[in-house]
Curated annotation (Swiss-Prot):
GO terms for molecular function: GTP binding; GTPase activity; mitochondrial ribosome binding. Gene3D superfamilies: 3.30.70.240, Elongation factor 4, C-terminal domain (3.30.70.2570), Elongation Factor G (Translational Gtpase), domain 3 (3.30.70.870), P-loop containing nucleotide triphosphate hydrolases (3.40.50.300), Translation factors (2.40.30.10). It catalyses: GTP + H2O = GDP + phosphate + H(+). This is Translation factor GUF1, mitochondrial. Belongs to the TRAFAC class translation factor GTPase superfamily. Classic translation factor GTPase family. LepA subfamily. It is an enzyme of class 3 (hydrolase). It comes from Arthroderma otae (strain ATCC MYA-4605 / CBS 113480) (Microsporum canis). Its EC number is 3.6.5.-.
Length: 674
């Protein structure tokens, strides 16, 4: 660094911020994230604490940056990450033993489903060989749909615990998360969990880790997170193996506005500091700083190397101001600081439309979605409208589980009443003039005439799927992949009984409950991970549902032509079961362009207008029947209103081991008066 001192900086995660230098000091070269020197920033007055330091803050103040450790836990779904986090918090005295369960799973949806959705952080203090160490633990999700949370967490860490279930061994998402961590250059500590189970086979799991990841398994720690067996051996391993030193989150408080989670790279930040955002150029006054211990614990200052939270006074009220990966520095030092590169923007793979049940709740729904976007920036949002459902939003997600969890959070945390359309995947249109357009909304897909005249090629997205399962189910899994238009890439037997199979699969097939079918075919023993692969030429069509020859745009889908007939027949059959009879005939059709693939008719109720008529009055009889006929025709064509748009949970048998469930939405035309 040529003897130059650096101005303080912070990086936010969902709204990552970093503090500016209050009292600049020279840091060791290995902690300098900048390739070239910067000039000295103006030295500000030393802080004058307004109240005595707490015991925790006194211990933190005495710890040099060389004894900071940032680490996370890398694992497959349900291999015990959150339980192990609880044991570590208990060992360090952060929480009381035996009184907590999955402390870092803070969302209701996480506790209900038993999975980790949001990466959560906690600061721990641990005395090792007579010296205090500051440990920042980040509990990360394991499911592929939340890979963005995982990658952001890895960016703020120096190392990770590679956790494997002793009874299940290495799984698909273990492999995927390992390569994410490896790409970030993290130091990995092998850990075998659940060694107390009767079905545990630690030697097999260690051999898989050695073969698959080429790790030194002699240093692996065998633990039981549930009972606490050998967990005390992990903390010394973390301190001795993980090197000393971008965290990634923000959330919303009704009273404080946006609260950001940040890692301080240089200098320090405290209440009263004036900060500026590199992303927006907006300036803020720090109202409070603190650490997660494990809940929000105020501190007088955050120093370089620490991970903590910041809120501003007055608060940041607009969630759009919070940019994941943003860099903050002190006002006046902007020219002396180079912002960090931030994070790679995730690409949405699955799209749904969201509409409020009551159109008057549109603005409340918009505000609720924006607040959730603060700490889940992998979701994309744009406004749209539907003739059937009115104003709403087109939301993009990383997968179907991601979508389902987001919906649950809207309902539980914000009390939103919403209607979601079936998930769809994007489609790329290559026009004859060479331009390309990606359509995420099926209702905007070109019609039949436009496709014939102006379109050169249609493409759909493919993914590279990695499937791990016992060898005995190999035939069933390959048959399932072939039935879903898959192309085999490779097959590897990494133990005598376990297979890793890689297939190129259309993303649309994965959205159509491929995972449920896979679990059914392997009795629940298979796991799958996938990554974006490429766009491929495909014969896709827009499948529409028509009610009385009027398209219901909210449920249209882009499907492969080979599936259009089957899906169309399923649609009309199941919709018929959930539409009540009316005073007029209801015709339900599934169509591709002008070609009607399937039709069901719901006969009307018969109102006997001749009941009180004398049998011999033929003229009067004809007149009443003609009047009834004209009335029904008028109701059906003009004088009818859409007064019921309902959500039905319809069982659809997809040929698996059990009935699967598909969410379907539909509009029904009902007369204003009979």
């Amino acid at each position: 660094m040529r003897g130059c001192l650096q101005p303080a900086r912070w990086l936010t995660t969902a709204t990552l911020r970093r503090p500016l230098l209050s009292c600049p000091r020279q840091l060791p070269t290995r902690y300098n994230p900048f390739p070239r020197p910067f000039h000295h920033a103006p030295v500000l007055q030393a802080r004058q604490p307004s109240k005595p330091l707490s015991l925790v803050e006194e211990r933190i103040d005495a710890i040099p940056i060389e004894r900071y450790r940032n680490f996370c836990i890398v694992a497959h779904v349900d291999h015990g990450k959150s339980t192990l986090s609880d044991r570590l918090l208990e060992l360090t005295g952060t929480i009381k033993p035996g009184e907590n369960k999955q402390v870092l799973d803070k969302l209701d949806v996480e506790r209900e489903r038993g999975i980790t959705v949001k990466a959560q952080t906690c600061t721990m203090l641990y005395n090792h060989r007579g010296k205090d160490y500051l440990l920042h633990l980040i509990d990360t999700p394991g499911h592929v749909d939340f890979r963005t949370e995982v990658s952001r967490s890895y960016a703020s860490c120096g190392g990770a615990l590679l956790l494997v279930d002793a009874s299940q061994g290495v799984q698909a998402q273990t492999v995927a998360n390992f390569y994410l961590a490896f790409a970030q250059g993290l130091t990995l500590v092998p850990v075998i969990n659940k060694v107390d189970l009767p079905s545990a086979d630690p030697e097999r799991a260690l051999e898989q880790m050695k073969t698959t990841f080429e790790l030194d398994v002699d240093k692996a720690v065998r633990v039981s997170a549930k009972t606490g067996l050998n967990v005390q051996e992990l903390l010394p391993a973390i301190i001795e193996s993980i090197p000393a030193l971008l965290l990634v989150d923000s959330w919303y408080s009704t009273y404080k506005g946006v609260i950001i989670l940040t890692r301080v790279f240089d200098g320090e930040v405290k209440a009263g500091d004036q900060l500026v955002s590199f992303a927006t150029g907006l300036k803020y006054t720090v109202g409070e700083v603190g650490i997660m211990y494990p809940s929000q614990t105020p501190q007088s200052v955050l120093r370089a190397g620490q991970v903590g939270y910041i809120y501003f006074n007055p608060g940041m009220k607009r969630s759009q101001e919070a940019k994941i990966g943003d860099t903050f520095t002190k006002v006046g030092c902007e020219s002396l600081v180079e912002p960090l590169p931030g994070f790679e923007e995730p690409k949405s793979m699955v799209f749904v439309a969201a509409y409020p049940v009551d159109s008057n709740d549109f603005h409340h729904l918009e505000e609720s979605i924006n607040q959730l976007l603060l700490n889940d920036r992998s979701v994309t949002m744009q406004k749209e409208s539907s003739e059937a459902l009115g104003a709403g939003f087109r939301l993009g997600f990383l997968g179907t589980l991601h979508c389902s969890v987001f919906e649950d959070r809207l309902r539980q945390e914000h009390g939103a009443s919403i209607i979601l359309t079936p998930p769809t995947v994007p489609c790329k249109v290559i026009w004859k003039d060479g331009k390309e357009t990606i359509f995420t909304n099926p209702s905007r897909f070109p019609d039949e005439d436009t496709l014939r005249v102006k379109v050169a090629e249609l493409q759909e997205p493919y993914v590279l799927a990695t499937i791990t399962f016992p060898e005995e189910y190999l035939g069933r899994v390959m048959e399932l992949c072939e039935a879903n238009r898959g192309e085999q890439v490779s097959m590897e037997f990494f133990t005598a009984t376990q297979v890793i199979l890689k297939y190129q699969l259309p993303l649309a097939q994965l959205v159509d409950d491929f995972f449920g079918k896979l679990k059914g075919s392997t009795k629940g023993y298979a796991s799958i991970d996938y990554e974006e692969s490429e766009w491929r030429k495909s014969n896709v069509v827009k499948l529409q549902l028509l009610v009385n020859k009027t398209p219901v745009d909210a449920v249209s889908r882009i499907v492969h032509s080979s599936q259009a007939n089957r899906l169309g027949r399923q649609w009309v059959t199941k919709f018929k079961e959930h539409v009540e009879r009316q005073m007029f005939e209801v015709i339900i059709q599934a169509a591709v362009g002008r070609n009607v693939l399937a039709r069901e008719t719901i006969k009307p109720y018969r109102k006997d207008v001749l009941a009180k008529l004398h049998a011999s009055d033929i003229t009067r009889r004809k007149k009443l029947l003609e009047k009834q006929k004209e009335g029904r025709k008028r109701l059906k064509a003009v004088d009818s209103a859409m007064v019921a748009i309902f959500l039905a949970r319809v069982p659809v048998n997809n040929g698996g081991s059990k009935d699967l469930f598909v969410w379907v939405w539909m509009g029904v035309w009902i007369p204003r008066q009979l």
